[in-house]
Each structure stands twice: as C-alpha cells, then as structure tokens.
Amino acid sequence: MERERTVIVPDVELFPGHIACSSESRSEIVVPCWKRGRIAAVLDIDSKDLNTFDEVDRKYLEEVTSLLYGKERDIWFAAGCFWGAQKFFKLVDGVVFTEVGFANGWEIDPTYKQVYTDETGHAECVHVRYDPEKVSLERLVNLFLNMIDPFSLNKQGEDEGTRYRTGVYYDNGEDREVIETVLGSFENKAGRKSAVELQPLRCFYKAEEYHQNYLDKNPGGYCHLSPAIFELARKTPKEQ
C-alpha cells in the first residue's frame, strides 16, 4: 500500500462504506480508515461504472480492513543507518512488517540523495509493525536502546549527520507514556540523559525500493551493527 496519508476530498460527504459522488458525477467508494485517531488509508475507486471492482481493488480493501480491525501496532525508530536497523527488527519474534524511510523532516517526499545532504530535516527511520501479544512496545524500545549508542548525538558507528540521529516516533499518547517510562528508567540507571529524541510522528516517507531489505539483497553490504547485536534480536524471548 502507498504511504499513509490524510486524503481530503472537497465537496463530498464521507460515510464509511458508502458511495460518494462529486459534482462531476465521479463515483467513488470511500472508506476512511481511522487507526488510533488518524486516517490510515482511504479506498478510492475511480470509476464511472459503479459495478467496476477489480482484483486490485479487492486486495486493497482487504488490507485497509486489516489495518482498521487488526491487532497490530506501529512504531517508528530512527537508529542510524536504516539498513542494519531494519534487519535487526525483522529478526524479533512478533514483528510482522518493516519498511525503511525518512521521518519528521520538512521536505515533502524526499529522495535518499536529498536526505543525504542533511538539508531536509529527516532522519533515516524504520517503520515497525508488531503483534503486541508476541512482543511488547516496552521490549522493542529496550531492544532499540541496546542496538544503538544512545548517548551519541547525530552519529552511529561511522555514519554522521542529523539524518543519523536516534529517536522514537509514536502515533498515540499511550505509546508515548510507555516509551517515556522505558527511556526514563534507562537514563536513570545510566546517570545521564540520552541523545534519543521522543516525538509524535509528523510524517514518514518510504525510501526507494533498493533500500528496502537492503542487507537481504546484499548480504555483504555495509552495516555498522555487529553480529552480536543481531543475535540479541534473534534470541529475544516471547512475551509471557
């Protein structure tokens, strides 16, 4: 599915699962999908024939319905270079989906080359969707803190720049409370503040396809994380 975004349709009244017709008599099936307080997707079938509903539309509707009623939750981690971070989270039992992209900058739909200049405000980021019955947000945040150098500002391994800053981005207040508790406990034990930023997710743009699952496609590719870090993810015990 395309990037999650809010879609505004002018001069049309929206009712979930109902037909909405614009002034140009353009027929649509519009399904606003609310996911913990925000629109996750809108199904928009552009056809003058109300009976037109193909296989692509059916699959899209199934995905939208899954997002709306499914138990999975979403969280976004900025952890330096996103190649290794994606591989790390994919190894965690209970993580059901990951994708890499750029988060919380001001440039709209940036390319990797644009983000690389450090002039877009974006951080390299991994979108993680997980099953909370198998792995908790608390455990994911603790794993994240063990994966990164949490006291290094704008630098992870040999990668340096604001695009490599560390952060956790959430889409609801309940998650913020959990993250604050975990991060606060970690900082208290360490006796100092971390460089990890905690913010609501303002935007996330999926990176180019060649960045997705990069280390699966390129097993010998660059990665700043050690093999021991990946073992930490692989051996994460299931939630009781």
What are these regions (language model features)?
Residues 1-23:
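Regulatory sensory and allosteric helical modules in signal-transduction proteins
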Residues 7-8, 32, 44, 76, ...:
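Conserved beta-strand segments that form the floor/walls of ligand-binding pockets within enzyme
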Residues 14, 30, 97-100:
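Hydrophobic/anchoring residues in structured secondary elements
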Residues 27-34:
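A short, aliphatic-rich beta-strand micro-motif
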Residues 34-47:
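Sensory-domain boundary capping and coupling elements
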Residues 46-72:
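Juxtadomain coupling helices with adjacent low-complexity linkers
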Residues 71-240:
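Flexible coil/turn and secondary-structure edge motifs
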